[in-house]
From Swiss-Prot:
PANTHER family hit by this protein: TUMOR PROTEIN D52, TUMOR PROTEIN D54
Stated name of the protein: Tumor protein D54
Residues that bear Phosphoserine: S3, S12, S19, S96, S149, S168, S175, S180, S206, S209
Lineage: Eukaryota, Metazoa, Chordata, Craniata, Vertebrata
Gene Ontology terms: cellular component: cytoplasm; perinuclear region of cytoplasm
The organism of origin for this protein: Rattus norvegicus (Rat)
GO molecular function, one term: protein homodimerization activity
């Protein structure tokens, strides 16, 4: 058996013999990271594009650092001015809403909604519904007006009755019947009062009683 094809068993006493015949092969670092050239580009164009890409990435890193510094400076200025986070949030929301209103999607949606609204308002169904609601509103207004007139008329009748009743009371008091009744009541009252003043507890005798007297003692 040739020595190059030695047993590679780990338990073999001849292990590692092949390592004596292996030598280090130098590798170009540029070959490791280099990818195959893009189709349609020469090596010179590829190198130029890679150089430009590295430059742009470096500029992006620089701009991020500048932006972070500017944001810190802006936050410090707001803190010194006493601007709250809520006010900043409102400004951001307002700015975002303004951006949304100016966006193409929002404009197209608004135009589409306007077209739909115009179509709906011009449709026969919408017009019939609007006419029906208008007629119902007119009937309701007329019914309320009639009810209000009836209530006002009823209140007017009650007021007129109260006024007539108030006016009729003095007229009734000045009538002959009312005066005759008052005279009779006054006569009876004066007789009762006069009898009590004379020490007599008996009521005045009625006409036609004569000289009849009551017995001294009751027959008990």
């Amino acid at each position: 058996m040739d020595s190059a094809s030695q047993d590679i068993n780990l338990n073999s006493p001849n292990k590692g013999v092949l390592s004596d015949f292996m030598t280090d092969v130098p590798v170009d670092p540029g070959v490791v990271h280099r990818t195959p050239a893009v189709e349609g580009l020469t090596e010179v164009e590829e190198e130029e594009l890679r150089a430009e890409l590295a430059k742009v990435e470096e500029e992006i890193v620089t701009l991020r650092q500048v932006l972070a510094a500017k944001e810190r400076h802006c936050g410090e200025l707001k803190r010194r001015l006493g601007l709250s986070t809520l006010g900043e949030l409102k400004q951001n929301l307002s700015r975002s809403w303004h951006d949304v209103q100016g966006s193409t999607a929002y404009v197209k949606t608004s135009e589409k909604l306007g077209e739909w609204n115009e179509k709906v308002t011009q449709s026969d169904l919408y017009k019939k519904t609007q006419e029906t609601l208008s007629q119902a509103g007119q009937k309701t207004s007329a019914a309320l007006s009639t009810m209000g007139s009836a209530i006002s008329r009823k209140l007017g009748d009650m007021s007129s009755y109260s006024i007539r009743h108030s006016i009729s009371m003095p007229v009734m008091r000045n009538s002959a019947t009312f005066k005759s009744f008052e005279d009779r009541v006054g006569t009876i009252k004066s007789k009762v009062v006069g009898g009590r003043e004379n020490g007599s507890d008996t009521l005045p005798s009625s006409p036609g009683s004569g000289d009849q007297t009551l017995p001294d003692h009751a027959p008990f």
